[in-house]
Amino acid sequence: MKKGVICIETEWQITTQQNKRSINTEPLMNFLQKLDDVPCIYRRVATRDELKYYLKKFHNKEFENYKIFYFSFHGDTHEIALEGEKENLSLMELGDMADGLFEGKFVHFSSCRTLLGSDENLKDFVEETRAKLVSGYTRSVDTFYSAIHDIALINELLTSTQIKPLLERMYKLYGGLEKKLGFKTSDELHV
């Protein structure tokens, strides 16, 4: 069975006025499904409880071939923002919620600045979750450019078996874009 993608995205309705384009990542998942028959699951969450519900559900055996977790949220240093919560969710809290779900999987944060800051926090997240690779951005990102990079990255993650050559190909093809977005991976930390 093919590797699949689980996309979890926050609700944007509270900031719709600021998000004039009212963009979400569901069309990216539809594109992957139509392009190469990639199994994709798309879910929207606004609260910790909703996120926790889906993370628990994805522990079921039927989801074991979904090797990529794609999180689309607002973000800040080592955090993601759930639209229905006052406080951001730290990566460590997310790791606790996941309860082993990310082990051996690829985890990508398509959110502003989530991987900004101390490498120790990212190392701790990788060690706790045992994720195969964690990636994301260190800068405030433009939706258009991050969507281009995200779809290219997910395609590489779906088709590649080795991380180093995958990341080298990505840099060769999209190095300028990666610099613009502040793309960062746990592979750089040799975790």
Q: How would you label these PLM feature ranges?
A:
Residues 62-76:
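Short, well-structured hydrophobic secondary-structure segments
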Residues 114-191:
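Active-site-proximal C-terminal subdomain of hydrolase catalytic domains
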Residues 21-28, 54-56, 84-96, 118-122:
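Well-ordered, non-membrane alpha-helical segments in soluble/globular domains
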Residues 45, 71-72, 83, 107-113, ...:
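Short His-Asn-centered micro-motif
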